[in-house]
Each structure stands twice: as structure tokens, then as C-alpha cells.
Design a protein with these regions (language model features):
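A short beta-strand-turn-helix
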Residues: 37-40, 45-66, 89-92, 135-137
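Conserved redox-active cysteine motifs that mediate thiol-disulfide chemistry
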Residues: 62, 70-87
Length: 176
């Protein structure tokens, strides 16, 4: 009986100790990590040369609304989207909007990428999407893939496949 009494008393003392306001602060739940390329994920760090040999990096994009476009010369929907992105770049560029196109290089180009861009009237930076770049953006499941990041560098829209310029502009306007 005495042994039970001591056991209950010990458990009670230790149990109350856990409720002490002066005990170590409660652990905060760990924030769930968001995978690259998922809504809410940050703009990955990158530094690449564009097709003209100019350096382009994520550091250059701080504080801007950013549209990242993964494309290929053989991709018909990409060819239809890029002139619209150029129009948005011309319209909103002065307000802190940037566009970077990453050429998906897993298949043979149907034409020289620089000539392709010139023919479409694209003046925003275009670079090659190496395996490392594609990984940093969470992998690319299809072309075109468009990602829109807000001024804080957080992914707020991801579209796989063709999208009309007007729909993209509706995403951009509140961010700019």
C-alpha cells in the first residue's frame, strides 16, 4: 500500500511539473516545407547566361513580379504564347515586371533559338534550361510551363500548357 502511495505521489509531482508555467517554452510546430515549383515556394537561386551571353540571375529579379517561361523551338503552344509574354513585358516592364524564358533543351531544336526569338519579336532574356535549372524549379512536367512569382519571390501561379495572354495578365495585374 505504501508503495502505491509513493508511486501515485511521484507521478502526480512529475505530472504537475509538466504544467509549470516556468518550464521550457513549448515547441513550435515545424513549418511544412514547400517543394520547389509548388505554389508558395520561393524563386530558386540561379545564375545563367542568356542566348546573347548576358548574365541573368535570380538576384536581378528581387522586388519584381517575375514570369518564368519554359519553352522549346519545337513546341507549337510555346510559339503562340511567347509574343503575348513580350507584349506583357513591354507593357509592365517599367512597373517592375520581368520575364525570363528557359529553353528546354532535351530535344533537338527545330531552328536556332536566337533566330527563333528574333522571328517572334522576343526581347526578354532567354537562357537554356539545364538539368540543374529544371531541378531548381521543381522539374518540368510539360511545355510550355509558366510560373508567376510575386514581388516577395513567392510562386503564386503555375500553368502547364498553353494559356491565353489575357488570363496571364489577370494574374499579373494585382501583383504589379
Amino acid at each position: 500500500m505504501l508503495r502505491r502511495y509513493v508511486l501515485c505521489l511521484s507521478l502526480g509531482v512529475f505530472g504537475l511539473g509538466g504544467c509549470n508555467q516556468h518550464s521550457a517554452s513549448p515547441s513550435t510546430p515545424a513549418k511544412a516545407s514547400i517543394a520547389s515549383g509548388e505554389i508558395g515556394s520561393p524563386l530558386p537561386q540561379f545564375s545563367v547566361k542568356d542566348l546573347q551571353g548576358r548574365q541573368v540571375s535570380s538576384e536581378d529579379l528581387r522586388g519584381k513580379v517575375v514570369l518564368i517561361d519554359f519553352w522549346a523551338t519545337w513546341c507549337e503552344p510555346c510559339k503562340r504564347e511567347m509574343p503575348g509574354y513580350q507584349q506583357l513585358f513591354a507593357r509592365y516592364g517599367p512597373e517592375g515586371f520581368a520575364v525570363i524564358g528557359f529553353k528546354f533543351d532535351t530535344m533537338k531544336d527545330t531552328e536556332d533559338p536566337a533566330l527563333f526569338a528574333k522571328r517572334l519579336g522576343v526581347s526578354y532574356p532567354l537562357a537554356v534550361a539545364t538539368d540543374i535549372v529544371r531541378q531548381k524549379f521543381g522539374g518540368i512536367e510539360g511545355l510550355p510551363t509558366t510560373m508567376v512569382y510575386d514581388r516577395q519571390g513567392i510562386l503564386c501561379e503555375k500553368i502547364i500548357g498553353f494559356e491565353y495572354t489575357g488570363a496571364i495578365e489577370k494574374v499579373l495585374k494585382p501583383l504589379i
